């Protein structure tokens, strides 16, 4: 196997974050690392940093989820949706993804990994707003916060939450979304940093409550 496609070894922190679910997480990482590039799910630079940049980055969000139904918008390869479903078997997940080949991958992995808490929907978020009612919604690397608000809020129950993974500019995105925040009645909007002191690349989340 060419060196640039070798899959990163799991970091020690993975075991503490996944607990008894570690074998399932390890199998998912193996599947994604060995087949993801070929299937067009991840780029050629990603296998060597699969754990640190993607899987750990995603699972750090798990403690923010509450028992109930969580939707993941634009799940893609399963980041963070499948990772969170592995870590939180007590939570039900709806993975919303419009691309057929990605949906096929997600459905295959749900069956392969034995995840009975996951439903996969081939759709865009705006197409299922009248069909589902979520307690929380997640998304990673989908769009700016201001654009995600009108896509995600209609999916969430009153009192539910947006839990959106963001980069280093999360605070600026919140500032830029002030009009959308007011229009869609979001409250308690905050940026949460996860993994500080534990990992090299922290995870930033914008969390907001739907009033």
Swiss-Prot record:
CDD domains, sorted: AdoMet_MTases
Species assigned in the record: Clavibacter sepedonicus (Clavibacter michiganensis subsp. sepedonicus)
Purpose of the protein: Specifically methylates the N7 position of guanine in position 518 of 16S rRNA.
Main location: cytoplasm
GO molecular function, one term: rRNA (guanine-N7-)-methyltransferase activity
Keywords on record: Cytoplasm, Methyltransferase, rRNA processing, S-adenosyl-L-methionine, Transferase
NCBIfam families, per database record: rsmG_gidB
Stretch forming the signal peptide: none
Entry's EC annotation: 2.1.1.-
Name of the coding gene: rsmG
Positions with a binding annotation for S-adenosyl-L-methionine: 74, 79, 125-126, 140
Protein name as annotated: Ribosomal RNA small subunit methyltransferase G
Similarity annotation: Belongs to the methyltransferase superfamily. RNA methyltransferase RsmG family.
GO cellular component: cytosol
Pfam families from the UniProt entry: GidB
PANTHER family xrefs: S-ADENOSYL-L-METHIONINE-DEPENDENT METHYLTRANSFERASES SUPERFAMILY PROTEIN (PTHR31760:SF0)
Enzyme class, broadest EC rank: transferase
Keyword rRNA processing: yes
Domain of life of the native organism: Bacteria
Localization annotation: Cytoplasm
